[in-house]
């Protein structure tokens, strides 16, 4: 498999302490991600940093003319060959598999594999993108920032590994919003999460696999 051996290009958010992190492809960037980035920069650009990991398919170029140029935002990216998603197998026997086509709006195996990967790739990379001292909040790209947050609250929330609880079922943690934490605990969490996510993708996959790994 090659998905865990990719060369990550672009700029890591070096020397940035408080970071909002998300990942998306160009279409999701145009529809959602850019608004999350713009709103975060508008309300919190002076005290935080935005890092975006872009996922491109063959023939798509990483061009700043389609992105936001700002000192408070950095980008890394990966680009896939045409047959990239052929390396994955779908677990059609898993009890929750049927929810995937419903949520993703497709019954096409290729498209489903792609959407599952797009939703999970961000977790495979945190140990490569961020240093042990960086406070990171990883969120879904379709969110939006509505106000200015106090930096001491941001650091308090992101000091330890933590995840958002599912609003309708607080006993369940969801992957929509997590912090890996800082220090040795944060480093261990990022590495363990990346390794377990990579291991999961070496087996048949399904929608919700990221939440189950978490």
Where are these regions (language model features)?
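A structural signal for well-ordered alpha-helical segments within the folded catalytic domains
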Residues: 34, 38, 120, 124, ...
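GT-A fold catalytic core of metal-dependent nucleotide-sugar glycosyltransferases
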Residues: 114-172
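Catalytic core and acceptor-binding pocket of nucleotide-sugar-dependent glycosyltransferases
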Residues: 184-214
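A short secondary-structure junction signal
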Residues: 147-151, 175, 191-196
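N-terminal anchoring/stem segment of glycosyltransferases
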Residues: 1-104, 131-132
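Aromatic-acidic/polar surface patches that form glycan- and anion
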Residues: 22-33, 115-119, 203-207
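Substrate-binding rim/cap in mid-to-C-terminal beta-strand-loop elements of soluble/periplasmic
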Residues: 169-190
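Surface-exposed cleft-lining segments at the edges of enzyme active sites
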Residues: 107-115
């Amino acid at each position: 498999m090659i998905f865990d051996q990719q060369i990550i290009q672009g700029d890591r958010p070096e020397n940035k302490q408080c970071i909002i992190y998300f990942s998306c492809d160009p279409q999701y960037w145009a529809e959602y991600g850019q608004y999350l980035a713009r709103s975060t920069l508008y309300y919190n650009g002076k005290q935080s940093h935005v890092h975006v990991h872009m996922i491109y398919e063959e023939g798509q170029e990483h061009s700043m003319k389609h992105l936001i140029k700002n000192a408070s935002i950095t980008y890394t990216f990966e680009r896939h060959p045409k047959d990239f998603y052929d390396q994955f197998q779908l677990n059609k026997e898993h009890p929750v598999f049927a929810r995937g086509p419903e949520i993703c709006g497709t019954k096409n195996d290729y498209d489903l594999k792609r959407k599952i990967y797009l939703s999970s790739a961000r977790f495979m990379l945190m140990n490569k993108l961020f240093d042990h001292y960086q406070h990171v909040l990883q969120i879904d790209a379709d969110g939006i920032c509505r106000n200015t947050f106090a930096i001491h609250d941001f650091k308090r929330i992101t000091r330890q590994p933590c995840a958002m609880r599912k609003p309708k079922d607080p006993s369940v943690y969801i992957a929509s919003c997590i912090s890996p934490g800082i220090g040795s605990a944060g480093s261990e969490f990022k590495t363990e999460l990346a390794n377990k996510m990579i291991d999961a993708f070496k087996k048949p996959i399904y929608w919700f696999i990221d939440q189950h790994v978490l």
